[in-house]
């Protein structure tokens, strides 16, 4: 061996510190062994320092999460060595007695267990500290006394006494007391930890513990075993089950000798709830990796100190282990760490090369997703209408009779009766024509119920109906008309072509004419006529409401408003009323089916008695003409020969029902023929109206037709029966947003609308161009704002990717067919390009410790890339890919994500956590197969009192035993039949076929996080289910059918100095509740009023009560959702729940919870889905989406405020430039903001 003596001298001086640096040492051949020892020790020390440096560099790759509830884990691969617990570790676990190392475990089985804990959680209390030497002791005695046990509540209090007998016969006693609440079973075990030299056995078997019994021979000298000797640290343990002690409430002493202890695996596990720390040191057989883990329980983080302190403790422990390495161990360990680092850097480099392509493709992929959304979503369109004096009529069944009359059509037709204003009336009577047959078939009282709908107006878009009731009944009258034939006389008009053939006796006779009148159309189209009542009739018409039904509406309209007035006219009676409110409605008609539309309540009643003798009064009368020129109207008399004579005559006005007198006188008492003329003037009853051509007959509610009632010789074509017609007039306007079925994409709708507008504005093209210029300016401002938002999002990583990207797509869609569409797309591409540039910059921060120049070159020469930036970028990329069910392999060449191939890489950065969340969030079934219970635990979710600290909202479904059953029966059914663990697996793989008849109650929670400002978040925790608490005060239970829930909000403030979080429950007003709402929520949750408690105290109790329900249930499903609209749908069900059609077997609480989960995941609900619930959720989701599209969301609100500020600043700059005469600045502003000035 060649020795460099000068080097040895320098190292001896530096290492030993015994001789000054200038001192020379004479080395002889006899000193060869000493030199070898010194050199070996020096090399080992140098290698150890280098190894610790490698560990430190690995630690730099590990990002320390600052999110509350994050469970810190660090795993460092080290070679297997033997390690013992030292003084520092025992100080951490609060040991307090210096004697032999003994631990006892008390296991509490409870029904009040957080969902993230095992059912049987062992609480291990270490109460002895090790000493430098472990003295031998012969035995120890354990005494357990039950001090108190409440079987109903599950509260238990135990007294534990341990007596140790040492080898020198010394005795040491230790006593302590255990107390716990709501426990169902208690078992106690204890561990004896000792260094062993020999284990003989097995000597028997412990049937209760199902373990063999070994004889233990202890090392006599008590020295610590070494690695070379092959001796190891073991634990011997014994379990004492004391269920019977608790159940029987007995006091029992248990004594166990050392030789009866059972041999366990050599693993030490300690958990001290006081210090809130869990240190696990595992030592398995040589040749297998030795792992050091330190874990901090998630719900106890705040009291355990910062993560940095925890990391430092682990690294200190690792340094102590490395200090025991030999030279060969160091070489193996160093190679292992170098390989890990190299492998990690290469894999990171392979994935980093493709990240720019991910971001560039995001826009197109998300547009496809939005396209699919619109193709399957109900759209609300704004609709408005106006009716201006719209008049119509429809017939009502009445007992009527016909009056035979003829008239000649001459001039304009009247609006109601079709009788001309100047018609000539011809009455006739010959050969019994005037006899009236009994044409009325009595049918008794006629009543139309209040479900009757009358269609009064209709077009292609909507139909208007009146909902009314109608009743009529005959009134007793002594007058019966037309019982005999008319006299043999024919009265004709001189203007008509007819032959005078009738005769009458002369000689001063007075002839009484009782002439019924029946108007008759003298054309070939229709035979019209006037009907009059046969006898007096009482009529009552009551209109309840005006209904407007939209033909294509699929559910209830929203944002309704309007005003309608209605006037009814029946005969000579008229009434009017006004309705000032509009509200959504669903109604079903007999002929037209179901409608969704609007209702305008109107309370209008018209009552009258129709009397044939007095109904028309003087409105229609038969009068004489003015015989001014009698020569043209001479009476002709025949007395044995024709010789003309002129006589006086008079004909007074008379009513057509009561008759009148015509007095004829002649000079001779002979038979003569007379000719004269009469008129029938028509008084118009309704002025200034527009008559509607649409006239719909009444639905035959009574099951009769016109032919069965009117049994005369005429056909059913007889129309315009004035005296049995209800005339109406509607005036007013309304507006609403009407739901239409899924249609075309927004861009296509925009194009169609653009074409329609162009057709309308051809006559005003210049004005329209100005308006379009303003719109384009607004679009450009929005795109500029969104570009800034996009850049801010990449940097802050606080906003939701979906919200911003959706706004980008919307703006591009709106401007797609406009003049500046190319600029819009260019601006959007520029935003994406800048984001890619920034991404490339932050991506490189993770390589700050890299020494490989080739890798740096491939990573574009950047200097820095942090794990946090890598994880954030992964969120952007994966959300776009998963939204359209695409894989990274479509855009990447190379390996799978690291978490699938190399578990070591899980602890380098957060990339694998983002991969898992994206796989799980978007219901990608192929990737979800890689999601296991172990990997899900790395998502940092908290199920009990905190919030979800993931980047996505979380929806969780819980099952718990039925509360109305006996507790033991309910728990047994829940555990044995429902089987929550099996149900959880089934929900992960096959949610569509999960049964819903388990003997358990189901409910759900939805938690999301809204970034408020730097270091502050608003957390909303929504609790929803069937039969749960509600703000309406309904009684709740597991069997009730109503939908209930509550929304509780918290503010989370981060203290960046030490990484802690502070959670404050917000006031009930922040959740949108009033004091009355809180009172009702409290009474529905606890079944009492809470007299004497303040509203704030009740709100706090409600929060704790909801937490208790969640903690005591089993979580069977946990989904991470990307859409922000799910929370608004849940709020709609909580605040305005629809009627739930509950069925214990077919549609119960489990159906409700699982179907809401399916809808939130984007799947179709089951065939048990309640229509009203689905419509309400879809309605709220669409309203929120349309608010975004119409610029009414928070995003656009912020954009609007920024735009207003920008415009104000531009306007001020423009005015200042004009005042100072800066023409160049004025021109620049005018060009930049064309159309604004």
UniProtKB/Swiss-Prot annotation:
InterPro entries: PPPDE_dom. The active site is at 1001, 1149. Residues 963-1178 form the PPPDE domain. It is found in: Virion. The keyword tRNA-binding does not apply. One of its GO terms (cellular component) is viral capsid. Keywords: Capsid protein, Virion. Its main location: virion. Disulfide bonds: none annotated. This is Putative structural protein VP3. It comes from Lymantria dispar cypovirus 1 (isolate Rao).
């Amino acid at each position: 061996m060649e020795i460099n003596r000068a080097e040895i001298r320098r190292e001896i001086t530096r290492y030993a510190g015994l001789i000054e640096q200038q001192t020379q040492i004479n080395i002889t051949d006899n000193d060869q062994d000493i030199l070898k020892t010194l050199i070996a020790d020096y090399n080992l020390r140098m290698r150890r320092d280098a190894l610790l440096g490698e560990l430190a560099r690995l630690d730099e790759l590990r990002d320390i999460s600052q999110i509350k509830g994050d469970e810190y884990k660090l795993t460092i691969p080290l070679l297997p060595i033997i390690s013992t617990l030292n003084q520092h570790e025992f100080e951490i676990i609060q040991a307090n007695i210096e004697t032999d190392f003994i631990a006892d475990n008390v296991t509490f089985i409870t029904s009040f267990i957080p969902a993230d804990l095992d059912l049987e959680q062992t609480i291990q209390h270490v109460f002895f500290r090790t000493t430098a030497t472990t003295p031998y002791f012969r035995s120890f005695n354990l005494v357990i006394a039950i001090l108190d046990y409440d079987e109903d509540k599950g509260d238990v209090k135990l007294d534990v006494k341990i007596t140790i007998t040492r080898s020198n016969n010394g005795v040491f006693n230790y006593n302590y007391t255990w107390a716990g609440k709501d426990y169902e079973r208690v078992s106690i075990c204890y561990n004896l930890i000792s260094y062993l030299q020999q284990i003989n056995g097995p000597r028997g078997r412990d049937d209760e513990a199902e373990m063999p019994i070994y004889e233990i021979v202890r090392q006599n000298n008590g020295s610590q075993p070494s690695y070379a000797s092959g001796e190891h640290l073991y634990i011997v343990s014994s379990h004492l089950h004391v269920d019977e002690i608790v159940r029987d409430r007995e006091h029992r002493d248990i004594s166990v000798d050392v030789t009866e202890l059972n041999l366990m695996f050599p693993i030490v596990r300690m958990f001290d709830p006081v210090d809130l720390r869990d240190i696990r040191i595992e030592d398995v057989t040589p040749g297998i990796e030795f792992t050091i883990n330190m874990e901090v329980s998630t719900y106890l983080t705040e009291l355990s100190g910062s993560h940095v302190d925890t990391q430092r403790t682990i690294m200190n422990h690792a340094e102590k282990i490395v200090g025991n390495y030999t030279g060969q161990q160091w070489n193996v360990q160093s190679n292992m760490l170098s390989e890990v680092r190299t492998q990690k850097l290469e894999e990171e480099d392979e994935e980093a090369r493709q990240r720019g392509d991910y971001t560039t493709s995001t826009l197109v992929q998300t547009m496809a997703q939005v396209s699919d959304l619109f193709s399957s979503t109900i759209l609300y369109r704004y609709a408005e209408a106006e009716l201006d004096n719209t008049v119509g009529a429809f017939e009502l069944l009445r007992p009527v009779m016909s009056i035979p009359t003829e008239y000649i059509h001459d001039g304009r037709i009247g609006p109601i009766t079709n009788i001309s204003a100047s018609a000539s009336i011809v009455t006739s009577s010959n050969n019994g024509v005037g006899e009236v047959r009994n044409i009325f078939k009595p049918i008794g009282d006629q009543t139309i119920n209040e479900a009757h709908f009358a269609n009064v107006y209709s077009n292609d878009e909507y139909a208007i109906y009146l909902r009314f009731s109608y009743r009529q009944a005959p009134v007793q009258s002594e007058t019966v008309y037309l019982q005999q034939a008319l006299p043999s006389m024919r009265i004709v008009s001189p203007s008509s072509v007819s032959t005078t053939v009738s005769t009458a006796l002369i000689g001063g006779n007075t002839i009484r004419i009782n002439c019924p009148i029946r108007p008759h159309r003298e054309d070939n189209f229709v035979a019209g006529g006037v009907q009059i009542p046969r006898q007096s009739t009482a009529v009552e018409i009551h209109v309840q409401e005006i209904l407007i039904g939209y033909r294509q509406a699929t559910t209830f309209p929203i944002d309704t408003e309007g005003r309608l007035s209605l006037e009814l006219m029946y005969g000579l009676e008229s009434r009017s009323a006004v309705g000032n409110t509009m509200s959504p409605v669903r109604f079903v008609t007999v002929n037209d089916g179901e409608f969704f539309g609007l209702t305008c309540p109107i309370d209008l009643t018209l009552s009258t008695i129709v009397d044939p003798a007095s109904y028309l009064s003087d409105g229609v009368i038969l009068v004489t003409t003015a015989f001014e020129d009698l020569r043209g109207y001479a009476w002709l008399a025949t007395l044995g020969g024709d010789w003309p004579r002129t006589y006086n005559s008079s004909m007074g006005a008379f009513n057509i029902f009561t008759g009148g007198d015509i007095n004829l006188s002649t000079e001779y008492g002979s038979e003569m023929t007379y000719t004269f003329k009469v008129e029938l003037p028509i008084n118009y009853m309704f002025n200034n109206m527009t008559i509607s051509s649409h006239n719909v007959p009444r639905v035959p509610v009574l099951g009769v037709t016109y032919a069965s009632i009117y049994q005369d010789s005429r056909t059913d074509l007889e129309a315009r029966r004035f005296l049995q017609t209800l005339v109406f007039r509607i005036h007013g306007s309304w507006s609403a947003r009407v739901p239409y079925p899924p249609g075309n994409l927004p861009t296509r709708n925009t194009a169609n609308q653009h074409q329609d507008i162009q057709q309308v504005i051809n006559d005003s093209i210049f004005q329209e161009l100005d308006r379009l210029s303003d719109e384009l300016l607004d679009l450009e401002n929005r795109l500029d704002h969104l570009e800034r938002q996009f850049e801010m999002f990449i940097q802050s990583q606080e906003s939701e990717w979906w919200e911003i990207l959706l706004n980008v797509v919307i703006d591009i869609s709106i401007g797609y067919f406009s003049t500046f569409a190319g600029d819009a797309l260019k601006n959007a591409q520029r935003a994406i390009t800048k984001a890619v540039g920034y991404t490339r910059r932050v991506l490189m921060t993770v390589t700050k410790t890299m020494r490989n120049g080739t890798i740096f070159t491939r990573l574009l020469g950047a200097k820095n890339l942090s794990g946090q930036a890598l994880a954030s970028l992964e969120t952007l990329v994966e959300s776009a890919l998963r939204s359209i069910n695409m894989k990274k392999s479509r855009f990447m060449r190379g390996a799978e994500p690291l978490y699938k191939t190399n578990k070591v890489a899980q602890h380098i950065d957060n990339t694998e956590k983002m991969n898992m969340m994206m796989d799980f969030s978007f219901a990608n079934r192929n990737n979800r197969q890689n999601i296991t219970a172990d990997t899900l635990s790395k998502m940092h979710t908290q199920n009990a009192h905190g919030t979800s600290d993931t980047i996505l909202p979380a929806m969780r479904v819980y099952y718990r035993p039925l509360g109305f059953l006996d507790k033991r029966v309910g728990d047994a059914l829940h555990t044995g039949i429902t089987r929550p663990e099996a149900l959880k697996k089934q929900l992960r793989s096959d949610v569509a076929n999960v049964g819903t008849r388990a003997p358990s109650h189901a409910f759900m929670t939805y938690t999301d996080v809204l970034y408020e400002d730097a270091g502050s978040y608003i957390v909303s925790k929504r609790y929803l289910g069937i039969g749960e608490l509600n703000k309406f005060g309904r009684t709740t239970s597991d069997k009730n059918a109503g939908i209930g829930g509550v929304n509780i909000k918290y503010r989370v403030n981060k203290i960046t100095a030490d990484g802690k979080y502070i959670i404050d429950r917000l006031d009930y007003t922040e959740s949108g509740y009033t004091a009355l709402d809180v009172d009702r929520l409290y009474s529905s949750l606890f079944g009492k009023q809470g007299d004497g408690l303040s509203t704030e105290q009740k709100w706090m109790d409600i929060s704790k009560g909801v937490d208790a329900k969640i903690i005591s249930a089993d979580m069977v499903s946990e989904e991470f959702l990307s859409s922000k609209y799910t929370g608004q749908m849940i709020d709609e069900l909580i605040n305005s729940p629809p009627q739930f059609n509950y069925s214990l077997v077919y549609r119960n609480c489990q159906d409700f919870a699982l179907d809401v989960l399916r809808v939130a995941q984007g799947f179709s609900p089951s065939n048990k889905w309640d229509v009203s619930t689905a419509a309400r959720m879809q309605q709220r989701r669409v309203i929120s989406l349309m608010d975004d599209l119409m610029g009414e969301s928070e995003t656009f609100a912020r954009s609007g405020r920024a735009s207003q500020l920008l415009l104000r600043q531009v306007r001020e700059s423009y005015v200042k430039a004009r005042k100072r005469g800066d023409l160049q600045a004025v021109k620049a502003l005018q060009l930049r903001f064309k159309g604004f000035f």
